[in-house]
Design a protein with these regions (language model features):
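Helical hairpin unit composed of two closely spaced alpha helices linked by a short loop
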Residues: 116-157
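The Walker A/P-loop phosphate-binding site
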Residues: 1-58, 245-247
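A conditional alpha-helix N-cap/helix-loop micro-motif detector
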Residues: 14-15, 74, 100, 137
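Conserved inter-motif catalytic segment of the P-loop NTP-binding fold
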Residues: 30-132, 221
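C-terminal regions of RecA-like/P-loop NTPase motor modules
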Residues: 54, 58-61, 69-72, 82-86, ...
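A short beta-strand-to-loop transition that corresponds to the Sensor-1 phosphate-sensing loop
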Residues: 38-39, 157-162
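Hydrophobic/aromatic beta-strand patches that form the interior of the parallel beta-sheet core
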Residues: 4, 33-35, 95, 156, ...
Length: 247
């Protein structure tokens, strides 16, 4: 199994990106294990429901509305959840153990118990590494890579970009925070930067099995269940609109 990293600064959409990838795996009827170290099971589920309702429901259920418990049709929402059971053969398992209580051994136990097709870790530096220096983080990254290889399951983990990358148009694998070993261990590193309210710019910063350096754009409107690739021209139009609306 491969070890992938999705990296960005704080508040740039890492969790949304991981959830979008997890939902794509659900569409393929896969069993997904999602280790949520920062948010609760309910918060992760509501984000998933926003994406899923964009495909399986006439009404898109916005995440903020679900979290606040208002401004949506409760009967329609319950019907949507019931119908999901018939439309999806995949399983979505969320482990929302509090930060610091998750370790590589506990993730291994979850893998053995649930036999997932793919694992997501949100996010890497919240795992109990047994220390707070770069050596401990390097050891942790190596253990996560080892889990992917031992169980032959892909593992995708969110990670932070360090402060040196601030102002960089799109950071590379060398800008991963905590330890250079994370980028060295990873088979694939995707870095991302939010260009405006609705546009995220992404870069394949490292790909062990082929060419890297590719750049693409996503339209990011999670409350309406939209997270889709757009052309560079369309991305620029959205950026201009967002900046105009902000002025």
């Amino acid at each position: 199994g491969d070890y992938w990293i999705v990296a960005a600064r704080l508040g740039q959409g890492k969790t949304w990106t991981l959830i979008r990838m997890a939902v794509a795996a659900l569409y393929a009827d896969s069993t997904v294990l999602y280790c949520a170290l920062e948010q609760s099971r309910a918060q992760i589920a509501m984000r998933c429901h926003s994406f899923l309702s964009g495909k399986y429901s006439k009404q898109v259920f916005k995440t903020l509305d679900l979290m606040h418990g208002k401004d949506f049709d409760l009967v329609a929402y319950r019907q949507f959840l019931q119908e999901l059971k018939d439309k999806l053969d995949g399983r979505f398992i969320v482990n929302d153990t509090s930060r610091g209580r998750v370790s590589p051994s506990s993730i291994a136990a979850q893998i053995e118990r649930n036999r997932p097709d793919i694992v997501f870790i949100d996010y890497l530096t919240l795992i109990n590494s047994g220390g707070d220096d770069w050596r401990a983080m390097a050891d942790l990254s190596g253990e996560i890579k080892g889990l992917a290889m031992r169980y032959e399951v892909p593992i995708v983990a969110a990670a932070q970009i360090n402060r040196m990358a601030i102002g960089n148009d799109l950071p590379g694998a060398e800008h991963l925070a905590a330890s250079d070993a994370i980028g060295q261990d990873a088979d694939c590193v995707i870095t991302m930067r939010q260009m405006s309210q609705r546009v995220i710019k992404m870069k394949l910063a490292k790909f062990r099995h082929g060419m890297d350096g590719q750049i693409w754009f996503n339209e990011f409107a999670p409350n309406s269940g939209r997270f889709e690739e757009v052309s560079g021209d369309n991305a620029q139009d959205l950026i201009d609109e967002d900046r105009s609306n902000a002025d």
